């Protein structure tokens, strides 16, 4: 796996986050290289104020901080940590960090953007750029050519302004746009909907997974969450909008709830939804984090999760494995990990490898999903503590 980005007689050493000894995926892609080549061709004067949006692991921030003032905007906690790691490893100049819910800096001279996967997130970003930037500020976005559709360009033209595209290079294409669309369209960042029969209403910020409707996996999981008066602390890992946390809170009013996600928007949505549906007297905590980094061992009675199989644009199963390993670490003896996943992902084999064959059972299944429960071995009588 290549870790050296070599362009224009410069070299950067870049790693994904968290670093893994057996990593097979690069920390940058051809889209980053295309943006770098394009901006280098502009021959910008030094000390420009550059805003980089959705910089996956900081390749662009590292590159441009050499001569410019860089602000990195991302909804991803992992992107922030990866960029910080790579900036430090390459002894780069200081970079400012913002989430994509923060205001666009007003003194921006150039915006560079990796296009987000979610159209809701894209529309939010375009509307914020239009509200803040002068028409003189160039905006250059990039994505795989096959992901830039006519509908994508229409969103640019509607919410941002005049837009054109480049030729394809290494299967990527640039999008050049100007903040001059009329009229300026105000976009509400929050999408709100309820779940029939559950008495739950959910607020969803633009980059929340399945933020416009209840996904099938969550609907299935809702039917199989336990009511257990012995539960003192429940963790919802990869919480999204916090739906499972809310339901567990309704079923188990005695339980302390911790909701964790790597998306800042997911964490804020979960916080709002827990407060709205359970009230402000409950013991709840919502945290942006890389899985369960920094959690105290043996601190929870139950962890529930629906692991993602994407990290940024890449398909990978290492996140699920990290979630399972972290959950085992922080569960009490006898604590339970409740997992939902697509049938084809084979989570049962991973869980049996980690928890032992006899400690993993099938809770429920349908033609698409399985729900599995893994129990951390209870301490044996007479065992050394």
Swiss-Prot record:
It is found in: Cytoplasm. Coiled coil: none annotated. Keywords: Cytoplasm, Methyltransferase, rRNA processing, S-adenosyl-L-methionine, Transferase. Its EC number is 2.1.1.174. GO terms for cellular component: cytoplasm. InterPro entries: rRNA_m2G-MeTrfase_RlmG, RsmC/RlmG, SAM-dependent_MTases_sf, Small_mtfrase_dom. It holds the Pfam family MTS. GO terms for molecular function: 23S rRNA (guanine(1835)-N(2))-methyltransferase activity. It catalyses: guanosine(1835) in 23S rRNA + S-adenosyl-L-methionine = N(2)-methylguanosine(1835) in 23S rRNA + S-adenosyl-L-homocysteine + H(+). Its main location: cytoplasm. Specifically methylates the guanine in position 1835 (m2G1835) of 23S rRNA. This is Ribosomal RNA large subunit methyltransferase G. It is an enzyme of class 2 (transferase). Belongs to the methyltransferase superfamily. RlmG family.
